Amino acid sequence: MYVVLKPDLDPEAQNRIIEELKNARLEVVALPGLDRRAFALVGSSQAAERFASHPYVEELIRDEAPYKRVARALHPHDSLVSIGPLTVGGDAFVVIGGPCAVETPEQMQTIASQIRAAGGHGLRGGAYKPRSSPYSFQGHGVKGLVMLSDAGSRYGLPVVSEIMDAQDLPHLAAHVQALQIGARNMQNFSLLKAVGSQNLPVILKRGLSATLEELLLAAEYIVDAGNDQVILCERGIRTFETATRNTLDLNAVAWLKNKTHLPVLVDPSHGTGLAELVPPLSKAALAVGADGLLIEVHPDPTQAWSDGRQSLTPESFSRLMHELRSLAEVIGRRMP
């Protein structure tokens, strides 16, 4: 439920109505950045309905969604999120590419140059790696962040990397332009609050078995903590199907674009687990309304330290970028 106050209210009158709402056992949630004086109300719908005819109230909007700050109900325009010089959202369609794991300085320099040459807009790479097996490569940590940052700086690409532990936040903040919260940490609420307390953009990936409402509530944690620079990412969910690594839920993109003002990316690499499926699913993501892609690219996928099977070669990535630009032009989207 939302309450919209009359525009001519003075601060004293506004404080008075807010106090009345609180006395009715309604939590009043501020919604900054709107053209109107609007607040989300959490609590009894019956109690909220009593304020529909209040002299200070212009409108009561009935919406029972549990997420408030990320909802589109009072925020009809798409939010724009800046990752360094790169703007995500609106009519632009962006592509962020890079290896699953940061391996060597030479690897990162090579792939950054190739992503730049193909027209990619950002560089991704994992310095801290959540792996299913404790014996798998776990990432280089701070050394990996330095390799990633150096490559991005040299080729003018803003960089994105995953955060797994709040104690690593100072290191990441010093080297990246955006944080990524992976599927396994989507409901790590202490981590969500930690990234919400700083001003770096956050790419929040959907959990393996998370509903879309749970994804939006996870985003709400970040925004409620003070950081409204949130980008959602559909990266596939776990189903009964075993032909692909996950099932890429493109329904989710259209649904999210209808329910939230936050930008939505798609990760077809994790969504399918198969490099040959990445190009068609990337084009489908563009067609269905996504704001961009996260794609794994490796100079030699057969030698990748992790997730080589789902990584594109630089040549495949370049072809895909050309195809995406052609499709974007047809459907009225813009690729920077």
Question: What does each model-found stretch correspond to?
Answer:
Residues V81-C100, A127-P134, K257-V266:
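N-terminal small/glycine-rich loop or linker at the start of catalytic domains
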Residues K6, H140, G156-D165, Q177-F189, ...:
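Catalytic beta/alpha-barrel core
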Residues F137-S161, V195-P201, L250-V264, Q310-R333:
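Alpha-helix-loop-beta-strand connector modules within alpha/beta enzyme cores
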Residues R72-H77, S133-M147, A166-D168, A183-N199, ...:
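Active-site-adjacent beta->alpha loops and helix N-cap segments on the catalytic face
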Residues I83, K193, Q198-V297:
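Catalytic alpha/beta core domains of metabolic enzymes, predominantly
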Residues A65-I96, H322, E329-P336:
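N-terminal amphipathic alpha-helix/helix-capping segment at the start of soluble metabolic enzymes
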Residues R124-V142, P299-R309:
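Glycine-rich, proline-tolerant flexible connector loops at the mouths of alpha/beta enzymes
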Residues F93-T110, S133-G139, P158-E162, G182-A183, ...:
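Active-site mouth loops of central-metabolism enzymes
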